[in-house]
């Protein structure tokens, strides 16, 4: 297998990230820095169903930074995926057009089901083989959350998805919808919890979570909480991942 250098850009509701890797028979090797920028693209999208001008400006600024990195690390291909906020935004074509002008690649707006599958594949690819399946992958994003159950305990990384569900609850969406004060009131917290519980009850009609042996958390929300629990003063993905 000839080695190829590829770039992946993941544009979510709260953050956008870039990873450049060389893929060969020997595996995957990171090339250059991993970059994450908090752009809050989903600002007010839950309420207005449109991208705000200032949110688009932040996204374009990050895209221009990524273009500079890619100029230093030429790639054979780029995949740019956009998720929850872009799915919901009525003016997403403007976003897609401008990103294509900056990066030369058009954002691919993927459905929640594909987001769930990709989250599962990515998460299980770094799980140690001795971690027992089935796995429940929880991808808690800014605009949506995906629950994915799967894994046969043999295939690695696992592609054996048994059930998946994507729901419109996430850290940005719930904050804007319910948590109007800082700190939020007890009533606002109760409203958020009730909203989340209702969505989870619906998800569990599709995803038989009772079969889970290992829960795997994915996303900035999960890694931030993990870093806090570990007492990290600076975020270190090598300490948190896996």
Model segments located where?
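N-terminal glycine-rich anion-binding loops that anchor highly charged ligand groups
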Residues: 27-40
């Amino acid at each position: 297998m000839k080695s190829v250098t590829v770039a992946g850009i993941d544009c979510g509701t709260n953050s956008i990230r870039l990873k450049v890797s060389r893929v060969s028979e020997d595996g995957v090797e990171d090339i250059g820095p991993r970059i994450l920028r908090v752009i809050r693209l989903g600002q007010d999208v839950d309420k207005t169903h449109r991208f705000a001008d200032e949110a688009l400006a932040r996204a374009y600024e990050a895209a221009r930074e990524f273009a500079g990195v890619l100029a230093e690390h030429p790639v054979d291909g780029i995949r740019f995926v956009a998720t929850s906020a872009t799915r919901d935004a009525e003016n997403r074509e403007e976003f897609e057009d401008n990103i294509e002008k900056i990066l030369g690649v058009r954002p691919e707006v993927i459905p929640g089901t594909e987001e769930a599958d990709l989250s599962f594949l990515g998460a299980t690819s770094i799980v140690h083989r001795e971690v027992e399946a089935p796995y429940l992958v929880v991808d808690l994003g800014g605009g949506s959350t995906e629950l994915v159950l799967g894994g046969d305990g043999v295939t690695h990384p696992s592609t054996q998805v048994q059930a998946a569900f994507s729901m419109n609850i996430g850290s940005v969406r719930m904050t804007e919808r319910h948590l109007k004060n800082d700190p939020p009131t007890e009533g606002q917290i109760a409203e958020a919890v009730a909203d989340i519980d209702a969505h989870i009850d619906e998800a569990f009609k599709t995803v038989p979570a009772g079969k889970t042996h290992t829960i795997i958390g994915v996303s900035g929300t999960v890694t931030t909480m993990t870093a806090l629990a570990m007492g990290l003063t600076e975020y270190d993905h090598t300490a948190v991942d896996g």
